[in-house]
Amino acid sequence: MKGLWLENNQLELRTNIPIPEPPPGEALVRILRAGICHTDLELIKGYYPYTGIIGHEFVGIVEQGPQQLINQRVVGEINAACGTCRFCRRGQPTHCENRTVLGIVNRNGAFAEYLSLPIENLHLVPENVSTAAATFTEPIAAALEIQQQIQIGKDDRVLVVGDGKLGQLIAQTLALTSCELLVVGRHKEKLTNLSAKGIKTGLADSVTDRYFDISVDCTGNPEGFNIARRALRPRGTLILKSTYAGNLSLDASSLVVDEITLIGSRCGPFVPALELLATEKVDVQYLIDSYYPLSQGLEAFEKAKTKGVLKVLLEMSS
């Protein structure tokens, strides 16, 4: 089969990759569409020493697996857990000590014609959700994880730093809490999309220091982190939603003096993410910049790296 293979920070299209043979408890999924995200771009930069097929945001058709899933559209949670380690026993499978992670850690990913994933990771796509929209399930779930980690209500002042793909989804999900929300970024056209949805926006240099209860950094760069940090009141909460390819320097003393809570935030719940798509409470269509066939995957990555581009989707089959 064809797939986008990453090795030594070099991405190439391979045409002779064996179709995976699912072990017991896993299903074979034929990929329909997959989305390129910030983590994929960071992998190429070397943030994690991964070799294999990359990609983790996908929609596919089950070809081998339980009868009730055959020929059904599915999306999949990316962490494959062992079920027996201390984190799994605590109900924290995303931190399984023996986990593999789709397209990121020791498991071939979604930028190929097929993948294998544990059956328990798969979720049916509602009939009224398009295949293109369903590719956003994983990042919407990641956005929702914030509300799994911290309670946010109408009296909270919340800042989102970053107007990219994830920032747009986080903004939409946080807006549903009725909090006092501000989203800042560097791209007026991206901020306009959120303003049209009734979400308050501004440029990054307009943030008032020490005003917000909660700030969310979606940028993955030191400048975004510093903006999010300066915006927090004492005993505020800083949530990090993006991976960093390099080291991050910070003033640890100020975190101590202001008693700042620092939260890393990764994968989230798929069921409510699919519900938001099915009820159209989150809009994703405007985020799609372009579609590329898998055979033009390298060109798709160049497009995804382009400044101002939001989501690029790969089409594996119809």
Go through each PLM region and give its residues.
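Mid-domain Rossmann-like dinucleotide-binding core that forms the NAD(H)/NADP(H) cofactor-binding site
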Residues: 129-204
